[in-house]
């Protein structure tokens, strides 16, 4: 016999009845938990519900046209906030400074026929690209956010003195993230990895992958709703580039390398974390192909206008003999981003970013702000319609707004791809190879100091050291075109041999890399340069493409992990295609 209490009375219950009662209680509790998660999984627009009682800290306290100058304080001191309480406070700052629908659109591109067509991206050229409305209100909201965001992060947000990699998962992105992870382990890197899963629904579909597969490789999934907290996840809807900023914010590491899922590293990140380029700067970025197209009006919005009379660089290279622009004609013939106070060229390619949360905590929060409100204003304000609109320049912009330093690699992207030999074909760029940041930094510092000592500007020979085909080894391979999918490749007659059921082209220019190649070449040792050249039959040399397909075979054909995007495919046929491709690539090496 057992007993329970009902209406204050003790009632005897038979064991069988007690078991039934306990089962019912367990079922009810489980359903309540599932219901709570379902609330998070439902798509809810990023607006506040009419019923504000469940999320008092997110209630709409906006004024009609101004923002209160009083500080937006957390419910208790920052160091006493839990991680979820901290993010609720941060998103409350965003909510209070959200743009009313009546103000939109905040920015509108100018018709092509009204834009200036000069080749040089001058101030006037940039200003001709878009009209920005309600600038005083945008400035006021920006100032309010910048003033209220904390300068340092509480320890509940990250674990001090930890290093790791974070990337984005969910369906196809989990597949690419897993390839990235196995490539990392092939290099011998043991850095922990966290994969951001956007929703509870995504997690349900990949629970086995998250809970059983990843832990074998010192990796795990982190869920946006669990990290942000239920109130924030319920009231804000995230998409696209915003997840990268969230991945940075929600990762547990102090020192973070954030990678796009289709990006892989070719040398151990541990060495870069432990190098001067990272220690000196706290944030490391890499270049895109194009010059920056950030609107001059953004500099006014953040309270750091570019006056426009002192040229301090030509592109990404410093000018040691400063050119004072004394006439309107000179100003109109000078690139805006060559002027003192502007962010230097080139634009940023954000497929990889290195970040120290202790030194750049506020930069991280401002990066998040620019991405949360990116679709409404900042993506367009930073790109002005140029290629690559998105999160890429939000990192450098946040650093300037917060007054923090960073280093952007000077070496140009090396584009890898293949030539289409069919009539009308040409070169197909398939991947962006970014260079080792420490060796780039070392060479840049040395070269610039030499020219400073001589009181001269950089000559073309010096600039050529940072060309796409320089000696500095590749650090990451951002394989962003035709993202790897053997089930799709085998049906594409442009790239597959349909008779032999294998690939018919190499995507990555026969790229080979050496393990620990960053130890081989140093710009301080000219005699060592030749050692970084490719040699035949080098046992330490790895065929990048062959290695990539071997990882695909391991995942799909050995481990037999089936991701959602492959659930309707004939995996026997897919695996045969993979094996045939590996055999073909092996003959080519």
From Swiss-Prot:
<dbReference type="InterPro" id="IPR029044">
    <property type="entry name" value="Nucleotide-diphossugar_trans"/>
</dbReference>
<feature type="region of interest" description="Disordered">
    <location>
        <begin position="50"/>
        <end position="77"/>
    </location>
</feature>
<comment type="pathway">
    <text>Protein modification; protein glycosylation.</text>
</comment>
<keyword id="KW-1133">Transmembrane helix</keyword>
<feature type="compositionally biased region" description="Polar residues">
    <location>
        <begin position="54"/>
        <end position="71"/>
    </location>
</feature>
<dbReference type="GO" id="GO:0035268">
    <property type="term" value="P:protein mannosylation"/>
</dbReference>
<comment type="function">
    <text>Alpha-1,2-mannosyltransferase required for cell wall integrity. Responsible for addition of the first alpha-1,2-linked mannose to form the branches on the mannan backbone of oligosaccharides. Addition of alpha-1,2-mannose is required for stabilization of the alpha-1,6-mannose backbone and hence regulates mannan fibril length; and is important for both immune recognition and virulence.</text>
</comment>
<feature type="topological domain" description="Extracellular">
    <location>
        <begin position="34"/>
        <end position="589"/>
    </location>
</feature>
<feature type="topological domain" description="Cytoplasmic">
    <location>
        <begin position="1"/>
        <end position="16"/>
    </location>
</feature>
<keyword id="KW-0333">Golgi apparatus</keyword>
<feature type="transmembrane region" description="Helical">
    <location>
        <begin position="17"/>
        <end position="33"/>
    </location>
</feature>
<feature type="glycosylation site" description="N-linked (GlcNAc...) asparagine">
    <location>
        <position position="64"/>
    </location>
</feature>
<comment type="similarity">
    <text>Belongs to the MNN1/MNT family.</text>
</comment>
<feature type="glycosylation site" description="N-linked (GlcNAc...) asparagine">
    <location>
        <position position="332"/>
    </location>
</feature>
<protein>
    <recommendedName>
        <fullName>Alpha-1,2-mannosyltransferase MNN22</fullName>
        <ecNumber>2.4.1.-</ecNumber>
    </recommendedName>
</protein>
<keyword id="KW-0808">Transferase</keyword>
<dbReference type="GO" id="GO:0000026">
    <property type="term" value="F:alpha-1,2-mannosyltransferase activity"/>
</dbReference>
<dbReference type="InterPro" id="IPR022751">
    <property type="entry name" value="Alpha_mannosyltransferase"/>
</dbReference>
<dbReference type="GO" id="GO:0046354">
    <property type="term" value="P:mannan biosynthetic process"/>
</dbReference>
<feature type="glycosylation site" description="N-linked (GlcNAc...) asparagine">
    <location>
        <position position="530"/>
    </location>
</feature>
<keyword id="KW-0735">Signal-anchor</keyword>
<keyword id="KW-0812">Transmembrane</keyword>
<keyword id="KW-0325">Glycoprotein</keyword>
<dbReference type="GO" id="GO:0005794">
    <property type="term" value="C:Golgi apparatus"/>
</dbReference>
<dbReference type="GO" id="GO:0000139">
    <property type="term" value="C:Golgi membrane"/>
</dbReference>
<keyword id="KW-0472">Membrane</keyword>
<dbReference type="Pfam" id="PF11051">
    <property type="entry name" value="Mannosyl_trans3"/>
</dbReference>
